[in-house]
């Protein structure tokens, strides 16, 4: 999964720095994020936990 895969959908996450304003699938549920724009955001996507790490722009599946 790449950053470009996060473009479609209706759930809006406005706190990703240069990705501010980007739309992601509405099935993604925000779990947590770092207000200083460093750290990660974790989503649950169709039963899988996906983490977006920033500012290094890495996305990977995680198990929480």
Regions found by a protein language model. Name each.
Residues 6-8, 34-38:
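A short, compositionally biased
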């Amino acid at each position: 999964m790449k950053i470009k895969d996060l473009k479609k959908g209706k759930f809006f996450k406005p706190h990703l720095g240069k990705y501010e304003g980007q739309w992601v699938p509405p099935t993604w549920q925000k779990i947590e994020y770092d207000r200083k724009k460093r750290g990660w955001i974790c989503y649950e996507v169709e039963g899988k936990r996906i983490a977006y790490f920033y500012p290094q722009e890495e996305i990977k599946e995680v198990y929480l």
